[in-house]
Amino acid sequence: MKSRQKGKKKGSSKERVFGCDLREHLQHSGQEVPQVLRSCAEFVQEYGVVDGIYRLSGVSSNIQKLRQEFETERKPDLRRDVYLQDIHCVSSLCKAYFRELPDPLLTYRLYDKFAEAVAVQLEPERLVKILEVLQELPIQNYRTLEFLMRHLVHMASFSAQTNMHARNLAIVWAPNLLRSKDIEASGFNGTAAFMEVRVQSIVVEFILTHVDQLFRGDSLSAGVDLESGWKSLPGARASGSSEDLMPTSLPYHLPSILQAGDGPPQIRPYHTIIEIAEHKRKGSLKVRKWRSIFNLGRSGHETKRKLPLRVEDREEKSSKGTLRPAKSMDSLSAAAGASDEPEGLVGSSSSQPSSLMPESLESNSMEGEQEPEAEAPGSANSEPGTPRAGRSAVRALGSSRAERCAGVHISDPYNVNLPLHITSILSVPPNIISNVSLVRLTRGLECPALQPRPSPALGPGPPGSVGPLASDEKSEARSVPGPLDDSSPAAMTPALEDSLSQEVQDSFSFLEDLSSSEPEWVGVEEREVAKAEAAGAAGAAAFSLGEDDPGMGYLEELLRVGPQVEEFSVEPPLDDLSLDDTQYVLAPNCCSLDSAVSTPDVEEDYGEEVFLSAYDDLSPLLGPKPINWEGVGSLEEEAAGCGKQPPTQDEEEQACSETRQEKEAKPRSTSDNREEAEATPETEMEAGKADAEGGEAERSQKVMDSFKEGSREELEAKEENSEGREVESIKETKDVEKIIGEPGKDEEREIGREEGAEKGDDTPVDSDMDPEHVFQEDLVLEESWEVVHKHEAEKGRESETKELRRKSDLKSREDQGHSEDSGSPEEGDDRKEGVFSKEQKSIDVETEVMRGVGDHLEEGALSEGPGVELLRVDSTEEINEQTSEMKQAPLQPSEPEGMEAEGQLNPETCDLYSCPCGSAGGVGMRLASTLVQVRQVRSVPVVPPKPQFAKMPSAMCSKIHVAPASPCPRPGRLDGTPGEKAWGSRASWRNGGSLSFDAAVALARERQRTESQGVLRTQTCTGGGDYSLSSRTPPCSMILAHSSRPLSCLERPPEGTEGSEPRSRLSLPPRELHPVVPLVAPQRQTYAFETQTNHGKDEGV
């Protein structure tokens, strides 16, 4: 002792206790194990059964004091109050002793061998390997390691009180026992340091859990003494009984699947801190510092990464408690298993996947050693109903701090908290998204385009209704497949839910949170639902919850629907559109292939549900082609029949539905080609002519009167029933167009010309009108094709009809004055002033426009002749009358619906709507009124959505002309809300950029070539002063043959409109001043370029 003290005084390193070589120290001291270890172990075993022992740090001053005492006294009295009050200072000193050893207890030399040994997959082999490596340790190190391991096993047996089970102890002790010189030389930077930490913890944990197997009394020179000493320790088991140890190791053999065997490369950043229940956490700056050293700011789930040690390790970790960045005073593990007895350590160390379930971790950790099988149950419990086995397995491996996070219920695969735009996109399969090309970010709203559509089987129920809830409900449905949200009336289709891309679920499951998924959407969904119901088609299908995989619905509809319709909007690209907050919803209709052709009902819904621009640049096609007046007549007759019924929508609906049914039966076999499709409108016109010549005038007058009388009454009924009718009417219209279109092209053209000539007499009166008005008139004329057809049929009665129109214009002005929704008073004035002027202008402009359009349109049938102009003029007049009538009913959100409700639009008339495009090679334009479930779109500032969310067909992108959009007043809703006086505001859409009609036609042609069965639909919003609900009301009048080029291309915006500046013809010229004709709330008219090669598909739809 004297020599030691003397040497110590001299500063000789030999005499030092801390920081000296272990072997030298033991040789000098003559002890089997360092005195520091023995003293501290005994003290801790007696007094250290406290929470966080060996994990928490003691007071640094106490540690330093105790250190000095060991240096001087060699065996200080640890039972003094200072140490009893700060037990952690003793445990901290013990760790410090090993940490300061020049050569770690397991030595630098054997680091690689230990790493290789634990990399072995099978536990028995790993055990052998580890044993071999341990045999290579110096005897002093081996004895010291055995003593320490047995001490730790003993302490682990109190894991219930200390929360320090074998795994936690291994994590805490590993850095002090096993280190790599190479990694230390590198400065502990990069993944190597994390790998080291993982290897350390795996090695130490394995040794700790296999103490009895690895250390046998006979292997130690002083084994007998050590064993006796250990046996004397309370709770210590006879180390020699390997038999007892074996069962504990068995659990490990079962889980030997553990990835730990995969080796260090899989080792993920090691967390020195074990995850603890947060309620137990206590604070200590020192501990925080210490934790920061090992935690490296990593989250608890990183422990999962390192869990891949071996199955046993992984299980143990999970069962023992998840490792988490420990807060200073927290216990390292969530719950230590009572199983942490020396054997228990093994058992407990056989972590149970229960780590997935934080709550079960604690209990499981205790039970783990005893019930190795519990692991399986634990894992199963972790995600009881989860289909994602792979992800669940990963979770099971790792400690589940993340799972504990309330905000992120990883364990709940179905709930997803994502931005609405993301969920909406996710709701649709990627291929659908690309097809629709309508995917875009919506502000706070689900992308309607992504909304699930009711499959044709579901019925005409407005598909849009499904959309709002779709993504949220879908996520919820996933989480809780059983109960669907009550918010949706329709039961979710489990098949659709199942069909949801598993990949999407897997990729976003971590975000899933059931709690918040639906509420965000509820308002919007309700709104849409109401609209869908108003449409009358809502039904139970209206809300097939988002669970019905909207994506799957899309796929089914897109794939199976006969002629596939790829809709593109001539309006500014959706990507560029700025969404109006909740109102801007993309109707699923836009995306469904069915919408254009297959199911008129659905089509109607879809069509109007499209984003309606404030006003669509593309006005109804200006088809110079004369419309078959026979077809027109028939349309007028139908309209008249319906018009007579206007006061009662039910009657109208019945009549229209009957007509539609009849026509629907006919049309679907008619058009196999574009030519047929194009021809069908003409044929319809001809048929209409034949029928209408006799009684068009009378019928038109009756219809107009009925419109006037019933418009107001119908407005209400229309809002309710119009949607359903529109669907029917659209179907019928399509059918009628198909049936009538083929034979009547020639007749229609001839008649158009003749009538044009006749109307030419009247035309000069309209010449005063500005071309802009003419365009508007043309739009109106399209809507008032009935009237035009009637005029042509009656040719002699044109003057009378004009007078009636004038009267109707006056009435419409008054009506408009009453109902501002339908149109601004300016529109009313325009109508009054411009009925004749519009006719003239329309003739002039049409003539010019049609000439210009004729160049671009393959349809040579579009005649620029006066007949067409006259037709348009007449139609304009009729439209004015109808407009006045409709103005009375402007409240109807969806004019097409409203009109149909009024009886003006019959299914037949809707069919007649189709504009005769050119005969051959032309794109058949069909005016399809659609449900006005459209959300209002503001044409303005073009705000492209984030590129990853904006998906638009490449072909489309190239053709879209984006012009600076001028801000416009919020467009009124087409959903029938009268309060929104935004109809006029739609004109602002004109100012927004959009596809030129030529581009649209070119697109249509290209697509027709590539997709023989595909139906291109160009949807345009009829915006502008002339576009009034009333004008749109008479479907027959809308049948007017217009050049297939939309008027918007030709028209100029009224001076009053914001974007009135002149535009190039390709970019949709801005409107100029419109005559004071009252502008009924413009409604979106959908013109479909249809190449219906498969009429059979239409029928099937």
From Swiss-Prot:
The modification Phosphoserine is found at residues 578, 875, 996. Residues 451-465 have a biased composition (Pro residues). Disulfide bonds: none annotated. The record marks 55 as: Arginine finger. SMART domains: RhoGAP. Residues 305-397, 450-499, 622-848, 878-901, 968-987, 1044-1076 are annotated as: Disordered. Keywords: Cytoplasmic vesicle, GTPase activation, Phosphoprotein. Gene3D superfamilies: Rho GTPase activation protein. One of its GO terms (molecular function) is GTPase activator activity. It is found in: Cytoplasmic vesicle. Residues 348-367 have a biased composition (Low complexity). Residues 309-319, 659-677, 686-762, 786-821, 829-844, 1052-1064 have a biased composition (Basic and acidic residues). One of its GO terms (cellular component) is cytoplasmic vesicle. The keyword 4Fe-4S does not apply. InterPro entries: PX-Rho_GAP, Rho_GTPase_activation_prot, RhoGAP_dom. Residues 20-215 form the Rho-GAP domain. Signal peptide: none annotated. GO terms for biological process: signal transduction. PANTHER family: CDC42 GTPASE-ACTIVATING PROTEIN, RHO GTPASE-ACTIVATING PROTEIN 30. GTPase-activating protein (GAP) for RAC1 and RHOA, but not for CDC42. Interacts with RHOU in a GTP-independent manner. This is Rho GTPase-activating protein 30. It comes from Mus musculus. The lineage of its organism: Eukaryota, Metazoa, Chordata, Craniata, Vertebrata.
